[in-house]
Amino acid sequence: FEDEELQEVKERFFREAATAGRLNHPNIVSIYDAGEEHDLAYIAMEFLKGHDLVPYTKADNLLPLETVVEMIAKVADALAYAHTQNVVHRDIKPANIMYDAATNTPKVTDFGIARITDSSKTKTGVVLGTPSFMSPEQLAGQKISGSSDLFSLGVMLYQLLSGTLPFEGDSMAQLMYRIANDEPTNILTLKPELP
C-alpha cells in the first residue's frame, strides 16, 4: 500500500470497529476491542459459528421458506436497532450476514462502510457498497438513510427465496439503470409455489 492508501485502510478498519462496537444486539457481531500493536491493526470480536449466507443464494441450495422469513426478520430487527443508534450499514448482502444453521441465528457483520447518520462525515456523491444490492438513491450517490439498508435486505430476501437477483445487467451501467428505473421480475413467476 502507498502511505495514503494505508491510512485510508486503517481509517476504515477502525471506523468499522468503532461503529460496530457501539452496537449491542443479539444479531449484530460484538466487537470487544480494537487497536494497533507493532504496526499491526486488530479487532477482537465475537467468535461466530457457521458461515455467510452466500451458499444459500444458489437455486439448488435454498433454505426453507420459514427459515428464510425468520432469519430476515431477525436481520431486520438488528438493522432497526442500528438505525435507532444512527448507524446505516450501507452494504447489506449475503456475504455480510453470518449464519449458524444449528440455532437459526444470523449476525450482521462488516460495518466497514457504515455511516453514523448524525455525523458530519455522511456525504452525498460517494457511492459505496455492492451494486446488485444497492438502493436507487445509493447508486445515485445521494444521502442515504436506513431505508437503503431495507432495500438491500429486500434484494437479499428475493435472492434467498428464488436463487436469483431481482435486477441483473450485462454491464454495470445496465444493472444500475435497471435498479433505478425497472420493476423487478415478479418472484412468483420464478417460484410460483411461494405464498
Q: Which sequence ranges carry the predicted segments?
A:
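Conserved ATP-binding/catalytic core of the eukaryotic-like protein kinase fold
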Residues: 1-185, 189
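Conserved C-terminal C-lobe helix
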Residues: 193-195
